[in-house]
Design a protein with these regions (language model features):
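Rossmann-fold NAD(P)-binding glycine/threonine-rich loop
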Residues: 76-98, 109, 114-117
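C-terminal substrate-binding/catalytic lobe of Rossmann-fold NAD(P)-dependent oxidoreductases
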Residues: 4-43, 56, 123-248
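Rossmann-fold NAD(P) dinucleotide-binding segment
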Residues: 48, 56-75, 86
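Hydrophobic beta-strand scaffold residues
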Residues: 30, 72-73, 97-100
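Short, ordered loop/turn segments at secondary-structure junctions
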Residues: 35, 77-79, 103-105, 130-133
Length: 248
């Protein structure tokens, strides 16, 4: 039986990549592509909703899917732990699945997990992320997820040291981690998680140079997983065994 997919935001750059991958997946078919002017009722009849819309629209997409008893895969940025908490009770009450993937790149997920693994051993951490000038939101969903994972890993050690955070130039605080966002031409996506301690520092860098090639393997994993998921799952690192299990 073919799984019918409603793709929201399918005309954007990520949406087009997802569409191309689904077209190559056995047992899946994109039945409808929704844009910014579409009525969300067009997801009716789908077996799975894939959201590649905008941070502002994404929460309505998730709610519309859950209210209809349809599982949803979210690739849109802007989903912090606080925002996910707003829809978690709805998902659990409906008995559906909502899978949030801040970044479909396996390398990016591994970089975030490595940063979390290193976090207990360094008292200071900051994140620098750079994206192309067309990316609307900042900090990126990947940076937010990385910061949240790093702080969660330091439960026994307490928060990171982050001096002078009252100054705007010190970046935006995400879970107590300063995050610095760059938006400029000539770059697709790059993140540096910089951990520091007395006499040393560790920098974990991930650089995307081809979005379609980098995201395709993660999309191929996430789409079938989301179809069968129950409850809320956050992060590609929870779909594969990379030896480091993160929190949803």
């Amino acid at each position: 039986m073919t799984t019918q997919v409603a793709l929201v935001g399918g005309t954007g750059s990520l949406g087009r990549i997802i569409h191309g991958v689904i077209d190559q997946l056995d047992g899946f078919e994109v039945r409808s592509v929704l844009g910014s002017a579409s009525d969300l009722a067009e997801i009716d009849g789908a077996d799975l909703v894939v959201d590649a819309s905008t941070p502002a629209a994404s929460i309505d997409v998730v709610r519309a899917a859950v209210e209809r008893g349809i599982n949803v895969l979210v690739g849109t940025s802007g989903w912090s732990q606080e925002r996910i908490a707003l829809v978690r009770p709805l998902v659990e009450s409906a008995g559906t699945g909502a899978v949030f993937i801040p970044n479909f790149s396996l390398g990016s997920a591994l970089g975030s997990a490595l940063a979390a693994a290193a976090a207990p051993f360094f008292p200071s951490a900051e994140i620098v992320e750079a994206h192309h000038e067309r990316k609307i939101d900042s900090p990126s969903g990947t940076a937010v997820r990385t910061a949240e994972l790093m702080v969660a890993a330091r439960e026994a050690q307490g928060p990171f040291q982050a001096p002078h955070v009252d100054q705007r130039a010190r970046g935006q605080q995400v879970a107590g981690v300063p995050v610095h966002s760059l938006r400029r031409p000539g770059v697709i996506a790059k993140q540096e998680a910089i951990l520091s301690g007395p006499g040393e520092s560790l920098t974990i860098v991930h650089d995307t140079v081809d979005s379609a090639a980098a995201y395709a393997p993660g999309i191929r994993l996430a789409v079938p997983f989301a179809r069968d998921a129950r409850g809320v799952v956050v992060g590609l690192e929870n779909l594969v065994d990379i030896g480091i299990r993160a929190r949803s």
